[in-house]
A protein has these predicted regions:
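Nucleotide-activated donor-binding/catalytic signature segment of Leloir-type glycosyltransferases, i.e.
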Residues: 238, 246-274
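Membrane-proximal helix-turn-helix segments that form the acceptor-binding/catalytic region
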Residues: 29, 85-92, 110, 122, ...
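Nucleotide-sugar-dependent
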Residues: 22, 214-218, 270-275, 282-303, ...
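N-terminal strand-loop element at the rim of the active site
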Residues: 13-19, 30-82, 158, 168-173, ...
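A charged, aromatic-enriched C-terminal amphipathic alpha-helix characteristic of glycosyltransferases
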Residues: 22, 192, 334-340, 350-382
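A short, active-site helix/loop in glycosyltransferases that binds the activated sugar's phosphate group
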Residues: 111-112, 146-174, 178-186, 247, ...
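Conserved donor-binding/catalytic core segment of Leloir-type glycosyltransferases
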Residues: 8-13, 152, 181, 194-217, ...
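Glycosyltransferase donor-sugar binding loop
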Residues: 47-48, 210-212, 233-248, 265
């Protein structure tokens, strides 16, 4: 292949919303910054919005949202194979004039398995748990892996888990691209929600809680630990389901929540640093209920660190390794299930706050997305130029 050639890349994506899919945005923009001859178009399907739409993302990349007839025909959660086959046929037709394919997440498995003849990259943000405990699915997954030119994983523990599980054997085409934030990921326009938060917070110390929208993310335990520390408040970023909100209100009472917890609802990724910079620390927990949780190191962990906030995390291997190596927070002696241990970790961090925050300031540039440019370059070379 010649570097002057212009490459049209089709990116196949299952997403809750393109403007909220931060990792994809960073990957595309980084590749286009390093290779001005690589051009993307996103082909997206979403869990709720089954309609066709074309446009341009907020970061300037053309997209097409796909309509799948099978999703209209069959109820949600049923006829998965028929829907997957429908997606494959649609993608095959849509991408016939493209030079290369980028598939994101396990949901695009059938496309990875059946699309041939073009350079193929499979970006596994999540572990393919549905393929791990069924012999037929495992066999099909291994075939799909062989069909790829490059695979990308969110961190080393996830890749090691797939290797130890016997799902991956050829490590020469495996790359790790961690979901670090970008330094300029901040919106300088402040909306009414933020102004209301600032007025509500006053001079109080605040804990940053993002994405605690499920029991496995220790929502009740995290809020309970904050409320156990006098004069500490919390800001909860992101949507909380009616079911979880009802449980939280029943556990702590509406009056106490109104005084010490501020719920922002869904906000755009670029606005999150506004709230982080008003907080003293963050809690990040994923209970050990499945591998995707246990091997997680979410973007909000790194967002807090590059913005100067120490963190309290659970014993999950990727997050614990960061705390043990750099001393930028406290690792609680729990996966998030024990409120008392989380509270102890918060108090420990507060007692040693100046020392820990100094380490955060010293190390925070280690977790910038741009630090991985050489990895991204090698991924593209292996994918398109081999």
């Amino acid at each position: 292949m010649v570097e002057s050639k212009q490459y049209k890349v089709a990116l196949v994506l299952y997403t809750q919303g393109l403007d909220y899919d931060d990792r994809i945005r960073k990957e595309i923009l980084s590749i286009q910054g390093l290779f001005n001859n690589v051009h993307f178009k996103i082909f997206a399907f979403t869990p709720k919005d089954n309609r066709e739409e074309e446009g341009v993302t907020s970061y300037g990349v053309p997209y097409k949202q796909l309509y799948l007839k099978s999703r209209e025909k069959y109820p949600s959660g049923s006829h998965t194979l028929a829907k997957s086959w429908d997606l494959y046929k649609t993608i095959k037709k849509e991408t016939k004039d493209f030079d290369a394919i980028w598939c994101a997440d396990p949901e695009t498995f059938l496309c990875v398995l059946l699309l041939h003849g073009k350079p193929l990259l499979w970006d596994l943000h999540e572990l393919p748990e549905s393929f791990m405990h069924n012999s037929l699915k495992r066999a099909l997954f291994k075939i799909a892996v062989k069909n790829t030119d490059v695979m990308v994983h969110a961190n080393k523990p996830r890749l090691k888990y797939l290797v130890s599980s016997g799902l991956i054997s050829d490590e020469s085409k495996q790359f790790v691209l961690r979901n670090y934030p970008q330094f300029d990921e901040i919106d300088n326009e402040y909306d009414e929600t933020y102004e209301s938060f600032v007025n509500w917070l006053g001079d109080s110390e605040c804990v940053y809680l993002q994405g605690i929208n499920a029991e496995m993310r220790a929502d009740v335990e995290s809020i309970g630990a904050v409320l156990a520390v006098p004069d500490l408040k919390a800001v909860i970023i992101g949507n909380v389901s009616d079911t979880r909100r009802a449980i939280i209100e029943k556990t702590f009472g509406k009056d106490q929540l109104n005084k010490r917890c501020f719920f922002t609802g869904q906000i755009k990724q670029l606005k999150t640093p506004q709230y982080i910079r008003k907080c003293k620390l963050s809690l990040v927990f994923y209970k050990n209920v499945k591998p995707n949780n246990w091997y997680c190191e979410p973007n909000r962990l790194f967002q807090n660190l590059i913005n100067g906030n120490p963190v309290v995390v659970g014993e999950n291997p990727p997050m614990k390794e960061i705390i043990d190596r750099y001393g930028v927070g406290v690792c609680a002696k729990t996966d998030g299930s024990n409120v008392e241990e989380i509270t102890k970790a918060i108090l420990s961090l507060k007692e040693n706050y100046e020392c820990v925050q100094a380490k955060v300031e010293e190390c925070k540039n280690n977790w910038l997305w741009e630090s991985q440019n050489s990895i991204i370059h090698n991924i593209v070379i292996k994918w398109l130029y081999n």
